[in-house]
């Protein structure tokens, strides 16, 4: 993690709360603190906030009630399943808090954007204007006719939803709205600024941070935080040295790394944002780095995604039960020669897809060829289209 830099600030500013990182969590923290009346600073080394994708999972609440999914699965069933998936290395109390209260946070989150269109099904038709402004859809809803998560070894609970739009950052519209709410309530942004070191008092309490303003002659500024500093700096996937130490298999096996490729955002100096800044700053003042790093390397498959069609390796051997989630699939492929697998399916794939599990990255619905394609809410990994060109998708 290197050595803490010896830098001195030429300017000092005082706040109640300082947040390092303007991603999803940092933006939400800034809005929440500002709405409570705190004087807030939010520091971000990019020229603006960062976000991507847009999928969430939550149980019960007003959205799921609207969609007919309220109480469809017991909270403790989901929490216990996630505990087993994590081999009990996680804290149940944290998962339970998510299961019981995430829906309240989502209501608050979307409140910032009154123009949001909430769809009642995954592929509900919307106008281009609605899609450009942003929509929220329940995923795999209604559930496929032949799918019952209760009968699955690896169930996908009907709890997921997704923000979609024509923006490159997909859910950027809703994150931007929350950032605007924070600013409207007095939060001050420091874009193009890098967190460099945390400050402590004689009792060990964190009292602030020194930041480097890359857009103002690399001037160092001390931001005091009377109530606390929040580290919301993302991960460390873009730093090869850190990855070699904490997750060496990612580097050794040359696994595609979105952070290293800058696909998760770049700073004002043109470098990837995922460089473990918060990990470093926390460790430098004596904080414990959590054990058991767990890189999210789930496989998303080829044309058919992670749909459980036949998988064979370069020797022509089938090597697994294919009906597993993307992370487990990735783990198995990494054990094969040259980390390579081939997914095989024949001309009956169109008949078989509706019987496939409604999982993340899989296909389980068929869109009829004559369905109107003018609906911009048409692109989802769980759907594919029957057409005369179906052969082109075979044996990928």
Language-model segments: which ranges?
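Extreme N-terminal leader/targeting segments of oxidoreductases
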Residues: 1-17
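N-terminal Rossmann-like FAD-binding beta1-loop-alpha1 element of flavoenzymes
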Residues: 17-41
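Conserved Rossmann-like nucleotide-cofactor binding loop
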Residues: 25, 48, 317
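Conserved N-terminal glycine-rich FAD pyrophosphate-binding loop of Rossmann-like flavoproteins
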Residues: 46-70
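N-terminal leader/propeptide and maturation segments of large enzyme subunits in energy/redox metabolism
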Residues: 79-105, 110-122, 354-396
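Conserved redox-cofactor binding core of oxidoreductases
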Residues: 99-219, 240-241
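Glycine-rich loop(s) and the adjacent beta-strand/alpha-helix scaffold that form part
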Residues: 216-219, 224-299
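An anion/pyrophosphate-binding glycine-rich loop and adjacent beta-alpha core
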Residues: 275, 279, 285-396
